[in-house]
């Protein structure tokens, strides 16, 4: 008795298990003998009845359906993304990536002078941002368009991966289960994580492409080469690829080789894939080093480690809530009402993912499907890294959503059919569609409290300083006609730091910053530095404006001469670091 790698079921066979990759692949292919002609009651021989979904297998039909679905999803996700202002209150700071892509479009391909965060997104989202800006220019909607495009690709590629090589009814059910779980991100927490800044979200696109290559390609010499190149490409943009794809692939290949002993010549495919994954790590590091040596951007080393016992205990339920929020299923603090219906429906999707992961773990060592094994290990490793790590941000485990959805699509259709739950799942899918529509027609965000780019232009203010959470947004919204650069206070002095910034921004020989836009302390629970510190440092302003919740102070001098660059190395979020700065620049 062996597991069918295509359908997840059990078939009885007298054939011995094939030990090499080519033979295993041939065993996975449907043969003509598997579909004998059927003898009717009249004694005549008839060909087997074609599936009612066979028309979907025609390539041009499938391509057309996926293209149409992708367009519809993109429009819906774009509308939902616009319900959120430009994402600036987290290390991802999407406005910064927008400016980086704009700089690259204008010749600074290596981002010379830029100090990036611990995730560069240089090879993941930045090319996407460049494409959007090439078409639409620099404006606040770039973030929304890019986010909608990324998530559309995640849903479509995830559905394709879940389908695998299955055909007919089973292939359709696989596809719909995976797509349904990801279809309708919750309006608030889901939009904030999945349809905002590029913080590990876009990384899922190249990972899904890699898994599709592993799933669809025959075991040939070029597959490990392609996988190595794609893995290195993705790791240059985001080191989380090491946890989500590199380690799982190495672990699974090692397990498969151990479980199927024999000459290395017969295990060349698994050995090559594991080697390709390991080589990609070195290649990615080499590429980053070459970029830095050539005068390009510098990348902050990721803060990687285990949380302390006290922090782990304090953050456990917060992290559980974040995981549920990722799936739109968080019921913490829920008041019964219309939102409870949405959460209950999303809980069904979350339950399917938990069920699929449990099935995958239980049958892991007997599983013949390489991609299922890789995804099971990826899910477990990513969840463990998040729960035992130091960061409680939901962005750190975004991959759980597409990985879990694909596992549900590949492992549960047969079980759902046997339990006669297919009609129920159809109703749930329809509910997901309704929620997507409701989210898409929600009014777009509008922030009237902050001075607009037009206001600054009308007052002839084109270069100034501001708080980190609001500054770059003005620059993006104005198409860089008005440029406001991020700063923070340290010991009552206005300073800046090397995190998602370009050193040239603060060069007094290149720019003349003559104003500061600052949030009124009473509007931020008195967490903002008082405006009196600005007056004490720069002297009385020539003009002061009150615009909404902000104060704009204007001087007749260049403020950059008194804004030093400080460094907080080893800090997850240096813009809010409370300790003393580092003695030298971070490496």
Describe the predicted segments one by one.
Residues 199-206, 243, 340-351, 369-417:
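Hydrophobic/aromatic-rich transmembrane helices and adjacent perimembrane loops
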Residues 145-171, 209, 354-357:
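Transmembrane-helix motifs of polytopic, lipid-linked glycan transferases
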Residues 119, 458-498:
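Short periplasmic/luminal acceptor-recognition loop of GT-C membrane glycosyltransferases, typified by
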Residues 96-103, 115-141, 318-335:
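Short hydrophobic/aromatic helix or loop-helix immediately within or flanking a transmembrane segment
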Residues 65-71, 279, 412-442:
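Signature aromatic-anchored transmembrane alpha helix within multi-pass, membrane-resident enzymes
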Residues 122, 165-215, 237, 391-404, ...:
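Membrane-interface micro-motifs in multi-pass membrane enzymes
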Residues 166-172, 257-272, 339-378, 388-391:
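Membrane-interface helix-loop-helix junctions at transmembrane boundaries of multi-pass membrane enzymes
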Residues 222-239, 245-248:
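Membrane-interface alpha helices of multi-pass inner-membrane proteins
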């Amino acid at each position: 008795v062996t597991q069918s790698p295509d359908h997840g079921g059990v078939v009885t066979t007298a054939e011995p298990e094939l030990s090499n990759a080519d033979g295993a692949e041939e065993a996975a292919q449907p043969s003509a003998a598997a579909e004998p002609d059927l003898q009717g009651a009249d004694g005549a021989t008839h060909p087997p009845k074609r599936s009612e979904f066979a028309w979907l297998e025609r390539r041009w039909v499938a391509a057309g359906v996926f293209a149409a679905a992708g367009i519809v999803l993109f429009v819906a996700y774009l509308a939902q993304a616009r319900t959120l202002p430009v994402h600036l209150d987290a290390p991802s700071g999407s406005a910064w990536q927008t400016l980086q892509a704009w700089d690259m479009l204008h010749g600074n391909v290596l981002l010379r002078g830029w100090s990036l965060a611990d995730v560069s997104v240089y090879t993941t989202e930045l090319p996407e941002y460049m494409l959007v800006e090439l078409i639409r220019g620099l404006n606040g909607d770039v973030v929304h368009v890019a986010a909608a495009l990324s998530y559309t690709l995640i849903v479509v590629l995830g559905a394709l991966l879940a389908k695998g090589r299955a055909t007919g009814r089973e292939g359709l059910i696989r596809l719909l289960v995976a797509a349904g779980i990801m279809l309708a991100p919750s309006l608030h927490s889901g939009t904030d994580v999945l349809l905002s800044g590029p913080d590990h979200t876009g990384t899922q696109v190249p990972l899904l492409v890699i898994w599709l290559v592993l799933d669809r390609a025959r075991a040939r010499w070029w597959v490990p080469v392609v996988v190595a190149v794609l893995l290195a490409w993705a790791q240059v943009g985001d080191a989380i690829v090491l946890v989500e794809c590199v380690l799982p692939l190495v672990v699974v290949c090692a397990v498969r080789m151990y479980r199927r002993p024999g000459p290395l010549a017969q295990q060349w495919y698994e050995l090559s894939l594991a080697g390709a994954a390991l080589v990609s790590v070195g290649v990615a590091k080499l590429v980053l080093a070459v970029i830095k040596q050539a005068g390009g951007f510098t990348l902050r080393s990721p803060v990687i480690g285990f949380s302390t016992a006290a922090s782990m205990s304090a953050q456990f339920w917060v992290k559980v809530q974040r995981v549920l929020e990722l799936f739109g299923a968080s019921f913490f603090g829920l008041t019964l009402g219309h939102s409870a219906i949405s959460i209950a429906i999303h809980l069904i999707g979350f339950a399917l993912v938990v069920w699929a992961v449990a099935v995958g773990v239980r049958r892991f060592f007997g599983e013949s499907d390489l991609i299922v094994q890789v995804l099971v290990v990826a899910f477990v490793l990513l969840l463990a890294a998040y729960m035992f790590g130091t960061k409680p941000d939901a962005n750190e485990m975004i991959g759980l959503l597409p990985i879990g959805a694909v596992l549900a699509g590949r492992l549960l259709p047969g079980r759902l059919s046997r339990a006669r739950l297919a009609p129920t799942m159809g109703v749930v899918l329809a509910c997901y569609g309704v929620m997507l529509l409701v989210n898409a027609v929600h009014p777009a965000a509008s922030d009237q409290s902050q001075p607009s780019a037009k206001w600054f232009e009308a007052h002839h203010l084109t270069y100034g300083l501001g708080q980190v959470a609001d500054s770059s947004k003005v620059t993006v919204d104005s198409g860089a006609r008005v440029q406001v650069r991020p700063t923070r206070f340290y010991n009552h002095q206005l300073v800046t730091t090397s995190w998602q910034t370009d050193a040239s921004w603060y060069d007094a020989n290149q720019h003349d910053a003559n104003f500061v836009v600052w949030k009124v302390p009473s509007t931020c629970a008195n967490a903002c530095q008082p405006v009196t510190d600005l007056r004490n440092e720069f002297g009385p302003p020539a003009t002061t404006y009150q615009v909404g919740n902000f104060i704009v102070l204007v001087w007749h001098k260049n403020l950059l001469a008194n804004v030093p660059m400080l460094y907080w190395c080893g800090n997850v979020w240096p813009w809010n670091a409370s300790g003393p700065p580092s003695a030298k620049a971070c490496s």
